[in-house]
Amino acid sequence: MDIMKGLYAAVLTSMLVLSGCLHEQSGIAETSTYEADDAAGSATSGTTDTLLRLRLSGRDSLSWTSTNIQLSVGDTVYRCSLSGADPCQISAQDGGDGNAWEPGESIFLRESGTDICTEPACTVVISVVYDGDQLTGDSKIIVD
């Protein structure tokens, strides 16, 4: 009987200790946000214009392998990547970790062989997704 009481007490203690570990943790996408601004240059009919600057806020870095950034102009969606193999290239400026977008770090999005914004006053819709979850931020910017 004493063995059963001891076992019962051990199970209850384990449940109490582990209960704090079992609740749902808030995701990085819920605690990270970004701000978007028009980049300094003007939109032209060229294919190498720097369009936007995005700055990450929050406490966590976003791994580039789990981060998906897309721009939309009209009905056309443009995927952005670090490699420049996509129509939109991500240029990381001031972070220390080349594998992640860090809080406080600004990145620039520029055309990479595709004319995304032909002329000034181009409306660009921005989507930043981390690990399948949409980040909160400026969703639409006018590029001049």
Where are these regions (language model features)?
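Short, solvent-exposed, Trp/other aromatic-anchored flexible loops in extracytoplasmic proteins
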Residues: 83-123, 129-131
